[in-house]
Amino acid sequence: MQLEDTIAAIATAIVPQQGSIGVVRLSGPQSLTIAKTLFDAPGNQTWESHRILYGHVRHPQTKAAIDEALLLLMLAPRSYTKEDVVEFQCHGGIMPVQQVLQLCLQQGARLAQPGEFSFRAFLNGRLDLTQAESISELVGAQSPQAAAIALAGLQGKLAQPIRDLRNTCLDILAEVEARIDFEDDLPPLDEDSIRQQLQNLYQQLEDILNTAQRGELLRTGLKVAIVGQPNVGKSSLLNAWSRTDRAIVTDLPGTTRDVVESQLVVEGIPIQVLDTAGIRETADQVEQIGVERSRKAAQQADLVLLTVDAHQGWTEADQLIYEQVKDRPLILVINKIDLGRADLVSYPPEITNTVLTAAAANLGIEALENAIIEQVNQTNLSPQNLDFAINQRQEAVLTEAQLALKQLQQTMAEQLPLDFWTIDLRLAINALGQVTGETVTESVLDRIFSRFCIGK
């Protein structure tokens, strides 16, 4: 990336005929010059930082009006990137913003690369790496709780404890190196104190690492597969739960031929519900493909809803399906209780989590949601009461830091020379710095920011 360039991009989603406002963003040394060339602000409006001007975007040669717009000025260093930033706030839709963007490019700006605005904010000290990653997570949040966790990261609630840990490691390193360089002039190291500090550091890292899986649940959601025989009401269950007609419902077995997905949020947890084809032996090649996809979906799901028909009871076919999914976290859904007696369904005694539903009548959905949340809580994955959560990249480097501290404890126990202590400490310090971006490599930065949208 050429950071001395002025960059431009559309910063809002382009939705044909639907967007009410479209924003074109500029950042860099020529932002203000380009804005003054293209924007006609009538009257005595003041071109000062953090002002909004009203006027028209005009073609620089023909002076033809392109759009009636507002212009927001945020000059360095009081801007998102700490550079001169200008935003054209145009009417929504495709044509106005694309025309304005094209004019900006013709005046010397270049099209921003994905995440380049945030990358500049990071390089200029406006954001650390945890905050930059939190912006991406906030944009992609699938639930209010996921958004709250991302916002906590943006506010520095993850970065601060990581910095505190790193500073403690730096303090210990300084003490050790001082004893190496000035052994005769300083008292011996207080090894008991260092051991206690290392134990505290290790436990704090363990607490932070314990947020990883819970945070991942908020980011990616819980994958729930509805499985069972044909015509036990799986599609009706999906429709009742999602309050839509996502799946076709008929009295004919085998109607569902493929996996039907629906996105839900239950108590702040995003849930991806998979309505699968009825599992049975069939000569129909298309249905066979659907059945195989059902088996695969069940094996990849975080939770399986094994659905049976209360009217039919527990059948040999139900037992065969159960044998295929019993190694997965499972809830038995006894459906169609309005047509049969649930107490007559003789399911295996090891199944302890059951829910009674009549999906066609919208009965039992709340009980099903409660059972799912209870299942999540039992696995210690509940995202409730999280102050922040780390992502997979952060988990990997924090694990490296923890391993380095553990190695240092072993190094001390073996009474190895102080030079060996510094090796372990530097590994821990480097890993902690990768979380906030103080020691991160260019390739890692490229990978992180390439996942952003262009206008970010």
UniProtKB/Swiss-Prot annotation:
Cofactor note: Binds 1 potassium ion per subunit.
Family matches, as NCBIfam families: mnmE_trmE_thdF, PRK05291.1-3, small_GTP
Residues where (6S)-5-formyl-5,6,7,8-tetrahydrofolate binds: R25, E87, R126, K456
Full protein name: tRNA modification GTPase MnmE
PROSITE patterns: G_TRME
Positions with a binding annotation for GTP: 231-236, 250-256, 275-278
Pfam families to which the protein is assigned, alphabetical: MMR_HSR1, MnmE_helical, TrmE_N
